[in-house]
Amino acid sequence: MVKDNAQKAEEEMAKLELELNSFDPATRADALDSLISHAQPESTRPSAEAVALNMHCHSFFSFNAFGHSPSSLAWLGKKRGFALMGIVDFDVLDGVDEFLSACGKAGIRGTAGIETRVFVPEYAAQEINSPGEPGVCYHMGIGFSSGRAPENVAPILTDLGRRAAERNQQILSRVNAYLDPVTIDYEGDVLPLTPAGHPTERHLVAAYI
């Protein structure tokens, strides 16, 4: 009987962990609250010898190979005893509020940022931090307290999204032409793979596969 109860508890935890990656925000929030309420504090306490941390996480709002949402990342950090975590999705701030809230519930100190790529004309002939791409620099913004950008800078995020969508569709057009008759549709095959309509090149690969 004890074994059966333990197995049922494990199955319920596994179900809730899957729900953390639902595209429905309410489902994610309910799942996290349930998991936190059943967590064993002593099993998720950071080690006294070393502080575990990961300050460069990507959620499914840009791309995460395991499909982790911001809430799922925070829960994973709690399970592994992380004291500090940071989210830095590409070109979007969609996961900021959820991540900071989830970290608060999980007892983790969280920070939120954004990662993008810029071209620096002055270094057009030199590699900066993107191997094989002279002039291209991965650029970070850190310390966001909300995903709601002020009106005076909100157009920057809009422009990042526009550029990403144009880049994706150019890639898709070229790959479709090369792989024809194996083709995919941006609206029908790619966008549904994202929770908020911000696909990356990796989503294109997933759609083809």
Q: For the regions a protein language model found, what residue spans apply to each?
A:
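Metal-centered catalytic cores of metalloenzymes
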Residues: 1-50, 65, 74
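A metal-dependent hydrolase metal-coordination microenvironment
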Residues: 24, 47-200
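Conserved acidic, metal-coordinating active-site core of Asp-based
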Residues: 199-209
